[in-house]
Regions:
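Gly/Ser/Thr/Ala-enriched C-terminal appendages of enzymes
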Residues: 1-177
Length: 177
């Protein structure tokens, strides 16, 4: 560094922020790599803090809306090649407390992630700022008031598919060996 002297060494949040009060809410972590044969190799970051353990693999995110209300019921994170059949009831579970299960029925599923680039080419037309604002308002309106309130809000459900959860658990087990 052009003559600069190093007088300190630290790792991650311990170097940049106070460990007890980290300021970075979202940091990109490697989720998977593709080998020369096109095989996807899922990766995970393990942490003592359960909330910092990453979700491995290439993923899709679905939002479930009640057909009768139009309100958002839950989000489901799946493997990139999984599909959701919204003509059938579906049991989802809390990945942190797997005994907490919920059967979702009479719902419409919508993929939330859209490709921006494919094979190095931009395939997405950016919306205007007013279009982004209108979309955000519309999406917030799909949330139940109980989720949006500031006092004792209901938790909005974001679950993992069984396949994705199984991969995460296997990677956690293998990291202990």
């Amino acid at each position: 560094m052009q003559g600069a002297q190093i007088d300190m060494f630290g790792v991650g949040e311990r170097m940049i922020t106070a460990r007890s009060e980290p300021v970075f809410g979202g940091v990109y972590k490697l989720a998977a790599v593709e080998d020369d044969e096109g095989n996807i190799i899922p990766k995970i970051k393990v942490s003592e803090n359960v909330e910092k353990i990453t979700i491995p693999h290439f993923k899709k995110v679905y939002r479930f809306y009640g057909r009768d209300t139009g309100k958002a019921i839950a989000d489901l994170i799946t493997l990139h090649d999984e599909t959701v059949d919204d003509t059938q009831d579906m049991e989802i579970f809390d990945p942190m407390a797997t005994w907490k299960k919920k059967t979702v029925y009479n719902f419409a599923a919508r993929e939330l992630l859209v490709p921006i680039f494919l094979s190095g080419k931009r395939v997405y037309d950016s919306p205007t700022l007013p279009e982004i604002q209108a979309y955000c308002r519309q999406q917030v309106d799909t949330l139940w008031d109980e989720v949006k309130r500031f006092d004792n809000p209901h938790k909005y459900v974001v679950d993992l598919s069984r396949k994705l959860w199984d991969i995460q658990q296997e990677l956690l087990r293998s990291s202990q060996r």
